[in-house]
Amino acid sequence: YIEAPALDAAGLDLLRSVHYEATRAGLDPQLVLGLMQVESGFRKYAVSSAGARGYMQVMPFWVKLIGRPDDKLFDLRTNLRYGCTILRHYLDIEKGDVFRALGRYNGSLGKPEYPNMVRAAWQKQWSYQKPAKLAQAGN
């Protein structure tokens, strides 16, 4: 049994916000955490060479398409709302195919590297596993 490290208030707020926005969009919160790990390394003020911003690396053009002009992409909840909405949009386009939706999200559709990185982070770092005793008991 390994005990998880204690989270500070900011860490708890991040996890709660991810859970809220992911479930609101019909996404697995652990998938969203894996995407955030790969996209920004959980850096709030990350900016890519293409101009993508924040935790989920949202491109500013999305503000004009689906948001309001005063939306701030470096705000945690705003960034998560956009990122989760965009990923849901791509999942719908790809009829639930997570691999292809991740490729669209990153702009690398058809290239396996990015979806594989997110999938690995999701499954190795963020996938919840029941302890063996609980799994055997059927809980």
Where are these regions (language model features)?
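Catalytic glycan-binding domains that act on GlcNAc-containing polysaccharides
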Residues: 1-139
